[in-house]
Amino acid sequence: MLLNRLRRVNEKNRNEFLGIFLHRYPAFVWSDAEPDDIPAFVFHDVTPEALKPLLEYLTENRYTTLTADEYVERASTGEHGAKREVLLTFDDSHESLYSVAYPLLQRYGQKAVAYVVPGRIENSRTSGTFPLCNWPQIREMNRTGVIDIQSHSMFHHSIPISSCVVDFVRPGLNFSFLNGDFAPVREKESIQESGFVPFGYPIHDWGARMREAPAYMENTGVINTCIDYVASRGGEEFFRMPGGRRTLRAVLKDSRLRNPPGRFENEDEQRIAMLEDFIASKREIERQLPGKNVRHYCFPWFRGSRLASALSFEAGYVSNAWGSLVSSTMRYSEEKIWHITRLPCRYIFRLPGRGRRGLSRVLTHRA
C-alpha cells in the first residue's frame, strides 16, 4: 500500500518534470509568453492562506473566471469573451470548498467549477465519514452561480486489477476513498459502498475504474475463508498476534487451491460498469440540484482511457477533465469529447500580470 502511494507521487512528479523541462506545459509556464489557450487550474483541499493570494493575483490582473460550459464553448470555437480568461476547478468537494473557497470567490467576484462525488455526499449538515461538503451546502453554492457543480464519478472508487493481494482489512487501515489504496470488489459492486468491511477481507493491487485495466474478481469462497478465519480468532485481536498477516496469506493461498480461480471482468462487463457509473453520477447530481444540466466529467486521480472518454460522451458529457498532461492518443475529433488539461494551482502565479513570480519560486509554492 505504501508502494501505491509512492507510485502516485512518482507519477505526479514525473508529469511535472515532463511538462516543464520538455516544454509540454503551456509556454507561459516556462517563458514570458502570453497563454495561447485558456489556462485551467486544479485545486483540492484549500486553506485561506493558500487560496487568497491566488485570487488576489487573478483579480488585480483582471482575469475572468469561467464555468465549464463557457470554457468548452470558448475553447472549441477559439473565440474568447475577454482577453484574460481562466478556468478554476476544485476536485472531490472537500469541506473547504464551502468554508474557504466559496466565500473567497464571492469576495473577489470570481467563480469556479467543482467536480463532486455524489455517492459520497451526506444529506445532513453534520459531518460525514470524510470531511466533504454536504448537499445543503452544494445546493447553496450551485444556486448562487459562484460554483458550477459537475461530476467526479459516482463513488471515486478504485478496482482490483490483479490477483496480487497486497494487504487485508485490519485495524488502522485508511478507508478514505481519496487515499485510493483500498479496492476490494464483490462482483460488480465495490464493497466500499456498503460502509462496513469485515476484518480479513483481501485487498488487491488497485487501479482507477476508468483506466484500461479490467477489474479482477476474487472467488467469494476465498474471500469468505479469510474473513471467517480472522473472525474465529478474535477479529481485531488476530492482527495483534505475531505473524498474523503472514498466517493469513498462507490461508489465502491454501483456499485458492481448493476453490475455483478468480477472474477478470470481460469487455462487456467493464463497459457496462463504466457506463453505469457515468450515468449514475450525472443523474444523482441532477436529482439533487433540480434544473442542473451536468455535462462535464473529471477523471478520479486524473486517470482515464479512450474507452472511458467514448462512454462519457455516450452518457451525455461534453468534456473530460484530466491533470496537466493528457495522452497523445486522445483527440477531440476522434473522441467527440473536449479534453481539459489542468495545471497545479500554483502556476496561476506564472500568468502574465503585475507581481508575476519566477518559475523557481512557483515550484516551491505548494498551495
Regions found by a protein language model. Name each.
Residues G119-I121, F155-S158, R303-G304:
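Short, catalytically relevant binding-site loops at active-site mouths
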Residues Y98-G119:
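A short alpha/beta connector and helix-capping loop motif
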Residues M1-T89, E95-S96, I161-S163, P171-A367:
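C-terminal active-site subregion of NodB/CE4 polysaccharide deacetylases
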Residues L66, V113-Y115, Q150, A321-W322:
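Structural detector of well-ordered beta-strand residues that form the stable sheet scaffold
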Residues H44, H152, H156:
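Histidine-centered divalent metal-coordination motifs
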Residues N123-P131, S163:
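Short, flexible/disordered intra-domain loops and linkers
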Residues H94-E95, F155:
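Short active-site segment of divalent metal-dependent hydrolases/proteases
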Residues L55, T59-E60, E79, Y102-G109, ...:
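Acidic (Asp/Glu)-rich catalytic clusters
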